[in-house]
UniProtKB/Swiss-Prot annotation:
This is Oligoribonuclease. It is an enzyme of class 3 (hydrolase). Gene3D superfamilies: Ribonuclease H-like superfamily/Ribonuclease H. One of its GO terms (cellular component) is cytoplasm. Keywords: Cytoplasm, Exonuclease, Hydrolase, Nuclease. The active site is at 129. Residues 8-171 form the Exonuclease domain. Its EC number is 3.1.15.-. One of its GO terms (biological process) is DNA metabolic process. It comes from Shewanella frigidimarina (strain NCIMB 400).
Amino acid sequence: MAVDANNLIWVDLEMTGLEPDVDRVIEIATLVTDQELNIIAQGPVLAIYQTDEVLAGMDDWNQKHHGESGLVDRVRASKCSEQDAIAQTIDFLAQYVPKGASPMCGNSIGQDRRFLNKYMLELEEFFHYRNIDVSTVKELVRRWSPETMNGFSKKNTHQALEDIKESIAEMQFYRKEVFKI
């Protein structure tokens, strides 16, 4: 498939917590869709090595969820550094979208952007400065058309690739049911 400035990059990170000043990225996944939200390519799904000290700093919620999903074990066994993850992800994205063209797409994507800005700046700079945040649409629908919220439910696996797929499906739902386009 050719590089297309209209393609959209969807990203999800799993982190050790919510504070970029103390927490770290432990998983990244990316998908590329066309502008109609059809998935055209799946990028690498990477567990990013972090030290036992960093992992021990996770709060109970993160210990439980990332432990049960197997992510903590994958992170401990990983040979992938943050720099490796940046390079592999950019190599993938550059096959489908020119640098600076796609907004960063996903759920609560502002949080992911904060971590990319702190730890993976070269990757953050690959995106346009705008965001397509499914969470924003969800919050508006919850307030303006709460009955519509019953039509979509998420599994919330807190695994990066599954979370991205759910974000795309959720945006497809809002497009059809709310925007009617």
